[in-house]
């Protein structure tokens, strides 16, 4: 999925319109995540009706107010609006955490052709490897709500990076707590071995008295 957008500029739907325009930024944002491509237009009444449902769906999966950890999910708006002004107006109806392609980028139309978008609204759900999980998840989102994400998660076989990071941190913390104890333990054992070796050498010297084959 990352390859699909390398070399492109993705814009955050926040007040500052921050851009993700480097390979590193794109990879960090998209890698190992399910991607929802929302093809829509503010000119479409159906899209306007669907937007609040989509916004609520995405917020409940990614906003810390609702969840302890944000889901490994990205929403990318692919505008099929008739003008940049119309796109800007419709973006106000979408989550602030979503991304979008700049209006002047013709890649919007290319993606529409690539995924055979003929009617709106359309939500194409992609696995991290760019394969299609759902060609149009609009009805799923409307009927199942956030439960459909669990189905996508299983189908995508995501690696839970948050869990892995926590696991590594816990192991590292445990190692740091026990390392000094182990070092003391091994130091004491080494001293005991050295003392025993010195005692054995002293015993050999005391009982030596010419016991060699040529003594």
Swiss-Prot record:
Residues 1-164 form the Thioredoxin domain. Its main location: other. It comes from the Eukaryota. The keyword Lyase does not apply. One of its GO terms (biological process) is photoreceptor cell maintenance. It is found in: Cell projection, Cilium, Photoreceptor outer segment. One of its GO terms (cellular component) is photoreceptor outer segment. Residues 190-215 are annotated as: Disordered. Belongs to the nucleoredoxin family. Plays an important role in retinal cone photoreceptor survival. May play a role in cone cell viability, slowing down cone degeneration, does not seem to play a role in degenerating rods. This is Nucleoredoxin-like protein 1. The gene is nxnl1.
């Amino acid at each position: 999925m990352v390859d699909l957008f390398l070399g492109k500029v993705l814009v955050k739907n926040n007040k500052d319109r921050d851009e993700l325009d480097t390979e590193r930024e794109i990879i960090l944002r998209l890698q190992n995540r399910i991607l929802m491509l929302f093809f829509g237009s503010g000119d479409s009444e159906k899209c306007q009706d669907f937007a609040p449902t989509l916004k609520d769906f995405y917020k409940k999966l990614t906003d810390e107010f609702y969840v302890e950890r944000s889901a490994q999910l990205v929403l990318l708006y692919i505008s099929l609006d008739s003008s940049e002004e119309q796109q800007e107006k419709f973006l106000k109806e979408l989550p602030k955490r979503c991304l979008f392609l700049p209006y002047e980028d013709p890649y919007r139309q290319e993606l529409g052709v690539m995924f055979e978008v003929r009617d709106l609204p359309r939500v194409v759900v992609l696995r991290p490897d760019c394969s299609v999980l759902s060609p149009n998840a609009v009805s799923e989102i409307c009927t199942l709500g956030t439960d459909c994400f669990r189905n996508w998660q299983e189908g995508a076989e995501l690696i839970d990076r948050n869990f892995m990071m926590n696991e590594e941190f816990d192991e590292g913390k445990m190692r740091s707590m026990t390392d000094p104890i182990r070092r003391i333990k091994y130091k004491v054992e080494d001293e005991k071995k050295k003392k025993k070796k010195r005692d054995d050498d002293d015993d050999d010297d005391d009982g030596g008295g010419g016991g060699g084959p040529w003594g």
